[in-house]
Amino acid sequence: PDQREEMYRAIRKFRSTKAIFTLDFQNDAEFVHGCIAGGRRYLHINANGDVDPCVFIHYSNANIYENTLLEALKSPIFMAYHDGQPFNENMLRPCPMLENPKLLREMVNKTGAKGTNAEAEETVEHLCSKCDHYAEEWGPVADRIWAEQKHKKAPYENYTEEKREHPELAAFEHADGSDGLRDEDLQ
C-alpha cells in the first residue's frame, strides 16, 4: 500500500510538472470510471481461444472457436462483470480481483466459469486468497486518498440502469433495451 500511494502521488506530480500525460494502470480508474475488463471496454482471448474477462483473471464460460464474440460477451461471467460494475465506488479500488477479491469469488462461483490458465491453473479461491491481505491493507489507504480529492462525474456510464449516477444516459439505449449490437456485426 505504501508503494502504491507513493506511485499515485508521483504520477500526479509528473502530470502537473511535465508536458506529458503518464498513465498509471492501477491508480487511474477514475479516468475510465472503474474496471475496464469483462467486456466493458476490454477483454482477453488466450492462445487456446478462451475468452477471459481480463488478462489477469483466467476464468471463462466461452471459447472464440465455439462462440461468436457477442455470445462470449453475453456469457455468464461477462454478464456478472456487467451487472457488478462498478465493483467499488472508490476508483482507487476498481479491480474485482486485487481490491475486491470477495466479488471475484462470487462471480466465478455463481457463473460456473472454468479456469483457463493452461500453464498454472488455480481455483478462484487460491487466486483470491493471494489478494485478500492486500485488499484489506489497501482499502483504508485508498479510502483516505479518495476522500482527499475532488472527482468529476463520468460523462458516460455503461453500467446497469440501477448503478448509473446519470439515469438520463439510459436514453442512449435502444427502445427495445438492447445495445444495438447484432451477432452478424461481430463475426
Task: Give residue ranges: language-model regions.
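A structure-centric signal for secondary-structure junctions around beta-strands
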Residues: 39-40, 48, 89-92
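Radical SAM enzyme [4Fe-4S]-AdoMet core and its adjacent flexible, acidic
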Residues: 1-38, 47-48, 52, 56-67
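Flexible mid-to-C-terminal extensions adjoining Fe-S/redox cofactors in radical SAM and related proteins
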Residues: 56-187
